[in-house]
Amino acid sequence: MYLSSAIQEILYVLPMNVTMISMVNMEEDNAYVVKMRRHFHEHPELSFEEVQTSRRIREELEKLGLEVKSVGKTGLVADITGSPGKTVALRADIDALPVTEENVEAFTSKNKGVMHACGHDAHIAMLLGVARKLAREKGKLHGTVRLIFQAAEEKPPGGAVEFIHEGYLRNVDAIVGQHVISTIPSGYVATYATVAMANADEFRVRIHGRGGHGSEPDKAIDALLIASYFVNILQSIVSRMTPAFKPAVVTVGTLNSGYRYNIIAAHAELTGTVRTFDAGIRTKVRNEIEHLLSGLCKAYGATYEYDYIEGYPALVNNPSVTAVIDQVASEVVGKDHVLHPDPAMGGEDFSYFTKEIPGSFYFLGTGNEDKKITSPNHSPTFSVDEDALKYGTEIMYRSALKLLG
């Protein structure tokens, strides 16, 4: 029987007291994960609309003899329980993005304008692969593994809070999550001992001036001009008002104003995001945005509205749980392939889980220059190297077993 070299490498390092799986099962499991990833990629659904996605996940879990419970509208939870012991949760998010796919594959998105551009299709598939492995060994399992298929990571307030509110983190000893990322090569893993991701907030600004004829700006209050100054001066918050050793990002994503070339705009609207790690810096940036806005509007005789929406909190890992993932990942991909980068400025509602119980979130490299898989997450040409999925499946599987003790 042919076994890929990657499978042989994994088998070579498997501890006998941790892994009880045959070579045949491993090949079948990997094929299953790829098949599932392609199915979900072909049929993406937006946040809180993952009805068919949820239905298919339920079908796959019920084939394994598991009792599946709904959480919220489209979230799912299922337990695999052996003898009495600890409880470890594994999480996969299941929603897609409003992106029109530009990849040409046999499994390209069939839902126009919707795409798994952040790899959640792979997350679902890998957790289903873990479920298959664990279900086969249920009789030898010491404890419970809780499978969390979470809706709406991409849309604050997110689906994680539903599991917390419904009590599915009670008496859970640890939780693990992973995320595919194309900027890290396939065969590599990135872990974070403590802070992994940032506070991810949103702000909205509306500036109200007075419209007028384009030839008579002195008789108007130009909201577009004020907004333009505001976009520029915002960058002084990070460069001049926060310590250099406490990172922050302030980005304006949209600016809408005016409707005709010769009419001075009476109104302007901006939206943007703020990313921070430190709670004090988060508050300072929030306040400084309004301070600058107020000063500009006062200087030009305009008024304003300002809304600041706190999004997902910073994702802070538990060092002990991360140490387990480090050890397992070293066994699966090799110690030299386990990276420890600086925290990412992205946001993740997995952070709500780690505020409640010990947990850890890591990145699985799925980029591959040789296969031209290099597009960033959230882009219309994003893809994953499917050869990396076996690593993510194995790391999640073995992390659960090791955390159970």
Residue ranges and their predicted role:
Residues V18-H116, D121, A125-H142:
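Acidic/His- and Gly-rich active-site-bordering loop/insert found
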Residues F40, A78, L90, H120, ...:
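Divalent metal-coordination and catalytic microenvironments
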Residues A89-R91, F203, F361-T366:
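Non-cysteine beta-strand/loop elements that form the S-adenosyl-L-methionine
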